[in-house]
């Protein structure tokens, strides 16, 4: 009987990888987003390990009322940045609610750059 309780608890835990993939998927599927940006230390991690950080462009912390998420992005040239930021927040909240039923306190969006397409002449 104790084993069933332990298995149920284990099944209900959210892995960091699943959480980050859910957030990253919601962000990159948002219209106007070119890519996730880089947090300080992401390139350092990659340099030492040779692997990309799962946390690329995403910082997560616990707040008093729920989870606080900082998301760093590069947007496409010509988009209305406030709309893109709002849509990222909406998409991430929806994805996390749908997938994990989590209480989100804040989602902060930081625009790190604007991607432009080079025209060859």
Features from the language model and the residues they span:
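Contiguous, often N-terminal, cationic amphipathic patches that form binding interfaces
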Residues: 1-81, 86, 98, 104-121
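Glycine-rich active-site/cofactor-binding loop and its immediate structural neighborhood
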Residues: 93
């Amino acid at each position: 009987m104790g084993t069933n309780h332990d298995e149920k608890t284990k099944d209900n835990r959210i892995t960091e990888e699943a959480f980050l993939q859910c957030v990253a998927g919601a962000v990159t599927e948002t219209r106007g987003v070119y890519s996730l940006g880089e947090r300080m230390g992401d390139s350092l991690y990659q340099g030492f390990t040779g692997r990309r950080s799962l946390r690329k462009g995403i910082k997560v912390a616990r707040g008093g009322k729920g989870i606080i998420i900082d998301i760093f992005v590069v947007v496409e040239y010509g988009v209305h940045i406030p709309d893109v930021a709002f849509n990222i927040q909406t998409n991430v909240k929806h994805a996390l609610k749908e997938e994990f039923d989590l209480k989100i306190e804040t989602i902060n969006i930081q625009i790190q750059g604007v991607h432009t397409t080079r025209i060859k002449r």
